[in-house]
Swiss-Prot record:
The N-terminal domain interacts with the head of the 30S subunit; the C-terminal domain interacts with the body and contacts protein S4. The interaction surface between S4 and S5 is involved in control of translational fidelity. GO terms for cellular component: small ribosomal subunit. GO terms for molecular function: rRNA binding; structural constituent of ribosome. This is Small ribosomal subunit protein uS5. InterPro entries: Ribosomal_Su5_D2-typ_SF, Ribosomal_uS5, Ribosomal_uS5_bac-type, Ribosomal_uS5_C, Ribosomal_uS5_N, Ribosomal_uS5_N_CS, Ribsml_uS5_D2-typ_fold_subgr. It comes from Trichlorobacter lovleyi (strain ATCC BAA-1151 / DSM 17278 / SZ). Belongs to the universal ribosomal protein uS5 family.
Length: 162
């Protein structure tokens, strides 16, 4: 699969989660921050990244850079939904994603909602099964969306092409 060039896309970023972590040293605690960021162009391209730094803005910037290197293309149908139901898995995190009819909206938790909105999916039903950790939810949703194929790809793969 060829790499998607982020410079050709009009990407917007959303911070999903910021956490403060502490390293215990002889003189006390040294704090730093990690930021989980999702980027997307609202027309099928989405990526996520994790940035770590001593300051929050720098961690977000690093997360955005990482996310731009980690872009995938999601097949979004004419209903602004996914073509079929799928379960994304990562670690203990599992997320069930179901296509929805027009007008349903994004029915998803915070971390998954960010990915769907960044990808331009505006009608979807989802449920987090297992871990609710934002890192696992984002990675599971991303993995599920990465495995989606268009109906044309499926018919060609099954040898049903007309």
């Amino acid at each position: 699969m060829s790499r998607i060039n982020a410079n050709d896309l009009n990407l917007t970023d959303r911070v999903v989660h910021i956490s403060r972590v502490a390293k215990v040293v002889k003189g006390g605690r040294r704090f730093s921050f990690s930021a989980l960021v999702v980027v997307g162009d609202a027309s099928g391209h989405v990526g996520y990244g994790l940035g770590k730094a001593n300051e929050v803005p720098e961690a977000i910037r690093k997360g955005v850079e990482q996310a731009k290197k980690n872009l995938i293309k999601v097949p979004v149908n004419q209903n602004q939904s996914i073509p079929y139901e799928i379960i994304g898995r990562f670690g203990a995190g599992r997320i069930l994603m179901k296509p929805a009819s027009p007008g349903t909206g994004v029915i998803a938790g915070g971390a998954a909602r960010a990915i769907f909105e960044a990808a331009g999916i505006s009608n979807i039903l989802s449920k987090c099964l297992g871990s609710n950790n934002p890192h696992n939810v984002v990675k599971a949703a991303f993995e599920g969306l990465r495995l989606l194929k268009t109906p044309e790809e499926l018919t060609a793969r099954r040898g049903l092409a007309e």
